[in-house]
Amino acid sequence: MTTTEIGRYGEKLAVKFLKKNHYRIIAKNSHQSHNEIDIIASYKAYIVFVEVKTRTVNSNMYSDYGTPASAVTISKQKRLITAARSYLSKNKKYFKKQPRMDIIEVYLSNETGKPLKINHFEDAFGE
């Protein structure tokens, strides 16, 4: 799989994970202010903006690139917050919901491509 295919597969798995945990998916791959939000979901009193990071790992869960969440740098966080603000300014119906920025890590086997583990970090970053 290419890195793009790995990323898209990770996003697909993240959507399934969120739905299984009673999140309502509002949008996927939403482009806002020249940035992309992987998943926008509604959950209880929250409007949740989710960044999905996927890594292929060996059987020991090791990746040469560190944890997926470590790829969400301060710069990336700022861009996601800008995109979330842009989305909320255009979608007033979610204005009463509390915004939350989550990260979902997806680990895939580098041998089989099958999912090994998903970590969900709620309220992972903010202003």
Where are these regions (language model features)?
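Solvent-exposed, charged helical/coil patches
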Residues: 1-15, 19-20, 66-70, 124-125
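Conserved catalytic cores of phosphodiester-cleaving nucleases, focusing on short active-site segments
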Residues: 18, 39-61, 80
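Catalytic cores of nucleic-acid endonucleases
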Residues: 54-109
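Conserved protein-kinase catalytic-loop segment immediately C-terminal to the catalytic Asp
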Residues: 38-41, 105-107
